[in-house]
């Protein structure tokens, strides 16, 4: 399956990434090869092969959930340069608030 340069540009734009024309071309080529390899896996005969969900022979071990006193908020905010109403103010990273 061929991944077009336009598709790479579209996904890059959604991810707020910018690539040169050469990088876009290389990504399109690399991604096309990756998708082709994955499509090859669909051709593998798995008839009679037991389903494997994990190779680890472990079980989830959960600890008892016990509430513990937290930290003092005033102490936590001592080194925060800008805050308001116990929220940390950080610089904007998306132009115009973003569209994501």
From Swiss-Prot:
Enzymatic reactions: L-glutamyl-tRNA(Gln) + L-glutamine + ATP + H2O = L-glutaminyl-tRNA(Gln) + L-glutamate + ADP + phosphate + H(+); L-aspartyl-tRNA(Asn) + L-glutamine + ATP + H2O = L-asparaginyl-tRNA(Asn) + L-glutamate + ADP + phosphate + 2 H(+)
Complex and partners: Heterotrimer of A, B and C subunits.
EC primary class: ligase
MF (Gene Ontology): asparaginyl-tRNA synthase (glutamine-hydrolyzing) activity; ATP binding; glutaminyl-tRNA synthase (glutamine-hydrolyzing) activity
GN (gene name): gatC
Keyword Cell membrane: no
This protein's UniProt keywords: ATP-binding, Ligase, Nucleotide-binding, Protein biosynthesis
Protein's job: Allows the formation of correctly charged Asn-tRNA(Asn) or Gln-tRNA(Gln) through the transamidation of misacylated Asp-tRNA(Asn) or Glu-tRNA(Gln) in organisms which lack either or both of asparaginyl-tRNA or glutaminyl-tRNA synthetases. The reaction takes place in the presence of glutamine and ATP through an activated phospho-Asp-tRNA(Asn) or phospho-Glu-tRNA(Gln).
The name this protein goes by in its record: Aspartyl/glutamyl-tRNA(Asn/Gln) amidotransferase subunit C
Domain of life: Bacteria
Protein family membership: Belongs to the GatC family.
NCBIfam families named in the record: gatC
This enzyme's EC code(s): 6.3.5.-
A biological-process GO annotation: regulation of translational fidelity
């Amino acid at each position: 399956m061929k991944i077009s340069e336009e598709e790479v540009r579209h996904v890059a734009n959604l991810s707020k990434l910018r690539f040169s024309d050469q990088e876009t071309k290389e990504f399109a080529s690399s991604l096309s090869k990756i998708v082709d390899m994955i499509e090859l896996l669909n051709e593998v005969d798995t008839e009679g092969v037991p389903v494997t969900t994990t190779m680890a022979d472990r079980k989830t071990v959960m600890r008892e959930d016990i509430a513990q006193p937290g930290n003092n908020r005033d102490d936590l905010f001592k080194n925060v340069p800008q805050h308001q109403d116990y929220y940390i103010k950080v610089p904007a990273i998306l132009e115009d608030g973003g569209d994501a």
